[in-house]
């Protein structure tokens, strides 16, 4: 038997929205392992998957708003903007999202996060 919870995380990581939708329809738990599916979708920039998972109840704020940190670290501007629109806390973990975007050279993300209240000098 296939572990649908693990399968939905892998499909989310790879951006396979139709697979994610199907797995959810047959009972995959998108909240398994502290909402890992939405974290992986955010890390790899799969906005459609992130939006779907949020619409199904994924918690973007789990683990100190790790989803927005991962999206920021990897320069996924559209995902960052969406997560912020869904009340992700960009100041979580001592403004770690903007620090990750900075260290990885994602200037567009850095500018956006600062415009939304992130603090650089801590």
Curated annotation (Swiss-Prot):
InterPro entries: Ankyrin_rpt, Ankyrin_rpt-contain_sf. ANK repeats lie at residues 3-32, 33-62, 63-92, 94-122. It comes from the Viruses. The keyword rRNA processing does not apply. Keywords: ANK repeat, Repeat. Pfam families: Ank, Ank_2. PANTHER family: ANKYRIN REPEAT PROTEIN, GH09064P. This is Putative ankyrin repeat protein L22. It comes from Acanthamoeba polyphaga mimivirus (APMV).
């Amino acid at each position: 038997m296939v572990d649908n919870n693990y399968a939905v995380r892998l499909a989310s990581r790879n951006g396979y929205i139709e697979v994610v939708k199907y797995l959810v329809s047959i009972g995959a738990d998108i909240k398994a392992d502290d909402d890992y599916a939405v974290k992986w979708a955010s890390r790899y920039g799969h906005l459609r998957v992130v939006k779907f998972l949020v619409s199904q109840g994924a918690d973007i704020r789990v683990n100190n708003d790790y989803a927005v940190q991962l999206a920021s670290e990897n320069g996924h501007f559209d995902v960052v903007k969406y997560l912020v629109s869904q009340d992700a806390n960009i100041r979580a973990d001592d403004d770690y999202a903007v620090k990750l975007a900075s260290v990885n050279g994602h200037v567009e993300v850095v500018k956006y996060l600062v415009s939304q209240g992130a603090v650089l000098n801590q």
